[in-house]
Amino acid sequence: MDETALAQQVGQVMMANDRATRETVGMDLLSCTPGRASMRMVVQDKHLNGHQTCHGGFIFTLADSTFAFACNSHNHNAVAAACSIEFLKPAHLGDELCTEGVEQ
């Protein structure tokens, strides 16, 4: 199996096993190739905080999940040791948030 096919299979298996990503948060895996992944999440009512904007924890979860798919695309278990995020502007109900993770 070539590395692109392996990465796609890893992404499918990870997504199938990750109920939090798929069901609880409602993210979609758009692509998973060697060292790269892209995901999306449409901001739903369940994602809104008291200011009626997307809770930062959901945005961080989307980024972290994208990172996980990219880093695990070679079929070697990997987890984050540390990460940080800068929020540039709020996301609102119905916004489509798209992420791309690239291995460095």
What are these language model-derived features?
Residues 1-104:
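Terminal targeting signals and extreme-terminal segments of soluble enzymes
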